[in-house]
Regions:
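Conserved S-adenosyl-L-methionine
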Residues: 105-184
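Aromatic side chains
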Residues: 6, 15-16, 35, 100-101, ...
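Amphipathic alpha-helical packing elements
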Residues: 1-25, 178
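Conserved aromatic-histidine-acidic binding/catalytic patches
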Residues: 3-4, 93, 97-101, 168-171
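Charged, low-complexity surface segments at secondary-structure and domain boundaries
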Residues: 1-5, 45, 183-184
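Class I S-adenosyl-L-methionine
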Residues: 19-121
Length: 184
C-alpha cells in the first residue's frame, strides 16, 4: 500500500485512519473548497484510507507519484480515434452485481483503456458513477485468455495492433455519495 506493507487490511486501515485523524485537525486542510461539513468521527467512519476518504484525499498525490510516471514531452504518443460498441457485457456477472442508472459494462470500457493507455498508467475517472472504469482498468491485467483472444482477433480484423495487456491504476471520483460508495 503506497510502498508500505501491513500485517493485514485492518492494520493498514488503522494506520491511515490515524494519519487522517491528525490531518483533520489541520485548519488549512479543512479550508479546501468542497470540504464536507461532517464531523471528524463521521468522516473517519466513512473512510477507508488511503484508498477512499469522505473528504479530499490527502494521499492522491502520493498515489500518482507512486504508481504514475512523469510526463515526458519527448515520448511519442499518438492514437487514432476508437469507436466501440458499449452495449457489450450487459449480461456479465460483474455488471449485474449492482444497479446504477448510467452504468456502462466494464467489458465495453476495456478496449478504450487498452487503446489509449499502457500497462501501469494511471487512469482518471472524474465522474466514476458505478466504478466500472476501475474494474476495467484492473481487468486489463486479469482478463481471461478467452476474452483476450476474442479481442485480439477483433482488433486484428480491424487492422489494429494487438493490445498491451496489463493492469492500469484507476483514480475514481464522484460527487454523488451513492456513486462514491459503489466505486469504493
Amino acid at each position: 500500500c503506497l510502498g508500505q506493507t501491513f500485517e493485514n487490511d485492518s492494520a493498514r486501515r488503522l494506520y491511515y485512519l490515524g494519519l487522517l485523524a491528525k490531518r483533520l485537525q489541520d485548519p488549512a486542510f479543512r479550508q479546501q473548497e468542497g470540504f464536507p461539513t461532517g464531523t471528524d468521527e463521521a468522516i473517519l467512519a466513512m473512510s477507508d484510507p488511503p484508498y477512499y476518504t469522505a473528504c479530499p484525499n490527502p494521499w492522491l498525490a502520493e498515489f500518482v507519484a507512486h504508481y504514475g510516471k512523469p510526463y515526458d514531452p519527448s515520448a511519442k504518443y499518438s492514437r487514432e480515434p476508437l469507436a466501440i460498441d458499449v452495449s457489450v457485457g450487459k449480461t456479465d456477472a460483474i455488471y449485474k452485481a449492482h444497479s446504477y442508472h448510467t452504468k456502462v459494462p466494464h467489458l465495453a470500457i476495456v478496449p478504450s483503456i487498452l487503446h489509449y493507455t499502457n500497462p501501469g498508467d494511471v487512469v482518471l475517472d472524474g465522474f466514476s458513477g458505478s466504478g466500472m472504469t476501475g474494474v476495467a482498468a484492473q481487468w486489463c491485467g486479469t482478463a481471461p485468455s478467452g476474452y483476450r483472444f476474442e479481442l485480439e482477433q477483433a482488433w486484428k480484423k480491424a487492422g489494429r495492433a494487438a493490445p498491451q495487456w496489463g493492469a492500469r491504476r484507476a483514480v475514481l471520483n464522484d460527487l454523488s455519495p451513492a456513486a462514491t460508495f459503489i466505486g469504493a
